Amino acid sequence: MLRSVKGFICRPLKLDHGYALHMAAKDCFSSVVSQDVQTPAEKPRAIFYTNESDPIKTFQEACVMVRKPALELFTYLKNSNFAHPVVRYVIYGERGTGKTMTLCHVVHFCARQGWLVLHIPDAHLWVKNCKELMQSSYNKERLDQPLQASFWLRNFRTTNEHFLKEIKTQQKYVWGKRDSTEQGRPLGEVVEQGLTRVKNASDAVGVVLKEIKQQCCLGSFRVLVAVDGVNALWGRTTLKKEDKSPVSPEELTLVYNLRKMVMNNWSGGAVVTTLSQTGSLFKPSSAHLPHELLGKEGFDALDPFVPILVPNYTEREFESCYHYYLHCRWLQHEKARTEDGKEELRFLSGCNPWQLERLSAPL
Amino acid sequence: MAAPTAAGLCPRLRAWLPRLTQVRWSRYNPSFLEPEVNKELYQKPFNELSEEEKEKQELKAVHPIKAAPPSISSSVFSDPMISKFTNMMMKDGNKVLARSLMAQTLENIKRKQLEKYHRAPDDEKERVECNPYVIFHQALKNCQPIIGLSNITRGGKTYQVPVPLKDNRKRFLAMKWLITECRENKHRRTLMPEKLSEELIQAFNNEGPIIKKKHVLHKMAEANRAYAHFRWW
């Protein structure tokens, strides 16, 4: 079960090189998670590519600091009534304060307890830099994203293997002239179908989300929907159709289906989301409050939600982060061990986790 | 020092110009003193200062002080060698980029060495050096040539004469070789920090192309030992 020892410390994510690093840290997180829930430890690890900033490669371990926002979320999740409609939690805060790590901590907690985890590492990746956009076969107005959908399906399959055998489809799905999934087949077949026929991957994602939503109200399993950068679902995209007209988010199948999942018209789980300005499109860098990042449409869609603020490090948290870096040999400079060095780090970073990590990287 | 050219002036004004002018000179009045950047000196109470330091403090009360250059910092983590190297890596005055490349290089060195540390068996763990600054300084020291070659013309022919090098020249040559090696002999897609960290670790272990270049220079100097008497300084 979750170890609530305060000495357990975190390395916040590096957000400077790009959001793919979020993905890697979260991918390696999912691998840590799945090691606890399932026994084969090597299999999940082999699938996720190791990025240069992978803490498992450098320190042979990946740790999270236990902080107040995460503990708050755990009490809420433990005391929530799963017969009521699902509660939405929005984690917000300034840049680099640890929102994504809090989300990862919650994902780890729920996976340890045996929930089904639908983790979208970065929703911003679905609304920008998409190489292949195809017209959806299911609905002529919508657009499919085969690459992103198949990537997500692969990660979903690795993290939730045993659920895929238990959940059965409740209706027949026809994928094409020759492919179809009968009623009562395990959900794993839908995922396989999405992975083998990449053209149907987005529709497979939609089917998976729909089935999980319908069946979790019955109460046999709990579902955690963890979305990082939920403000991407209601913003603008940088994608363009073939006639150069801009694409709005609801025209993307993945975004459309995810929006339905984040609604509070189902029960038996929780929805924990994070706002992120770093990957967001057309938002000023000073915007960090929910109203500014979500916009009117997003706020109305997510309303009512429980906001959770993640502040900068307190004195105690800064101390523990500093001592962890010393312990795992990350701070190598001789002067970094002195009081002067510590005070200088504290002043220069302003107790911001991201700044502290950036400063201590070359030291 | 350089000789000024006065191409457009009339002969009377040309006679007024001095024969040699200083190229690098300071506009400060000679009475201006250098600034003191060392924090520890200011934290010592007055009684503990030695005689000359007390005199210096009194002088400072009377004389004006020069402005501190932006490259000096009172941070405990600042290192003059690293600053010099960063300046040499800088192109078109883009210090921000040069500094970030240097930070990434040091980080890469640290990561590679930490990986090696964790992979090594317990008795060898002590020998793996993880401090990127130690590796940087040692690598530079290993790359410094001891003896250099200088061109001297005698009787129409130019000879390569072995010549002792000053400390500054040695440091400059080591840094210059390191940077040119990393800029030229790398694949188009590899980034500078990656290549630099690789070269620094190799130089730390006394292997790699820069150490070879140093040995080639030493061998040339050894081969031209006969002309050493041409040197007059």
From Swiss-Prot, chain B:
Q: Where is the signal peptide?
A: none
Q: Does the keyword Nucleotidyltransferase apply?
A: no
Write out the GO cellular component annotations. mitochondrial small ribosomal subunit; ribosome
Gene3D superfamilies assigned: Ribosomal protein S7 domain (1.10.455.10)
Keywords for the protein's UniProt record, in alphabetical order: Mitochondrion, Ribonucleoprotein, Ribosomal protein, Transit peptide
| CDD domains reported in the protein's UniProt record | uS7_Mitochondria_Mammalian
Kindly list the GO molecular function terms attached to this UniProt entry.
Answer: mRNA binding; rRNA binding; structural constituent of ribosome
Q: Which cysteines are joined by disulfide bonds?
A: none
Family per UniProt?
A: Belongs to the universal ribosomal protein uS7 family.
Give the multimer and partner information.
Component of the mitochondrial ribosome small subunit (28S) which comprises a 12S rRNA and about 30 distinct proteins.
This chain belongs to which protein, by name?
Small ribosomal subunit protein uS7m
Q: Lineage in the entry? A: Eukaryota, Metazoa, Chordata, Craniata, Vertebrata
